[in-house]
Regions:
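Histidine- and aromatic-enriched segments that form or immediately flank copper-ligand environments
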Residues: 60-89, 115-119
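Extracellular/periplasmic metallocenter environments
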Residues: 9-27, 87-129
Length: 129
């Protein structure tokens, strides 16, 4: 029984102790965005890209399936660009899109955590020339 309790505690606390794997890098003509989402929001608030640049987003959900709000899933969506990436609990999911025109776009998670109304569950993609 004690072993079961220890395993459950480790499983639930694992995201707290895992190293952060977020950041934005450039790989040739591809902007690589590794972004993490948890109940307290995204860990990146602003992304910059150039017109015509390919953007690869890897979204990691740090929450487990026991969260009552959204079941631990998180989303990275940009309506104007047709982007909708959903990461399952404690998982990573990726998607790629091309920044086709200049402007400032809002990315958000509308699955949990108050959705678009929560300022920590949104950010900006700025596409420049």
């Amino acid at each position: 029984m004690v072993v079961v309790v220890i395993v459950v505690v480790i499983y639930l606390l694992r995201p707290v102790f895992e190293p952060k794997a977020s950041g934005i890098t450039q790989l040739g003509n591809v902007k690589v965005v590794n972004i993490q989402a948890a109940m307290d929001g995204f860990d990146i608030a602003e992304i910059r890209a150039k017109v015509g640049e390919t953007v690869k987003v890897s979204l990691r959900s740090l929450d487990n399936e026991h969260h009552t709000d959204g079941g631990g899933k998180h989303q990275f969506a940009i309506d104007e660009l047709g982007v909708n990436i959903i990461a399952n609990p404690l998982s990573v999911n990726s998607g790629t899109f091309t920044a086709t025109k200049t402007g400032t776009y809002t990315f958000y998670c509308d699955i949990c955590c108050g959705g678009r109304a929560n300022p920590t569950m949104s950010g900006r993609l700025i596409v420049e020339t």
